[in-house]
Amino acid sequence: MASDPPQQNGSNGAGFHEPHDSQTEPESEPETLPAPPSEVAELVAACMRFVASKYKVALDGTPDTLSLVDQYIREARIAYQARPESIDLVAPAVGAYLGEVMRQEFAAEWFAEGSHEAWRLYFHNVFLSFNPVGIAREAITMKDEAGWNAHLTLDPAERELIDERLAAMPDVDEDEYYLPTTRFDVITAVVETLRAHAEASGTGDVTFSREDYD
């Protein structure tokens, strides 16, 4: 695999640029996340290369760029029909990129050891985990991928709350249902709902680490 692109000032180790306003200092410093595991960073860089090569546009790790990843997935679906093995190259790269966008947006940590099936993203401020690579595989195949853990792992006591929230979301067609942007919107709704519930129940200051998910 080719080496990662050089990091810019303010990058987080995955090639993502951390926003910084040189004119106005924030009142409080946001949580600083460590760089992702090297296995993840390499795949993020690969996704950036794939998209830049095809569309001549650079991904920057922000949620706004997921619409471009959606288009890449649509083309990957066509390639998958002709060459099913292509999913083993594309899904890990797209999953790593999507997972890293979510990690930066919502504060989470990677478990990226062993096979890609075992990878997880563990959230810090809510009890939530899943496998972003599994989400990427389902985006390509447009069906549930058994054993890839793309489903949401939640506190059982909060499952009904989240089921109700997801049931209230607008319907989307099959093409959009599995796309990265739709998945990001779902995770946003889940995180916001769980945070509101935690604040209302007086547990808003509780955080989670990887050990809490064992």
Feature annotation, model-predicted:
Residues 2, 123-206:
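A recognition module on extended beta-rich or small alphabeta surfaces enriched in W/G with H and D/E
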Residues 63, 206-209:
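Short glycine-rich, low-complexity/disordered patches
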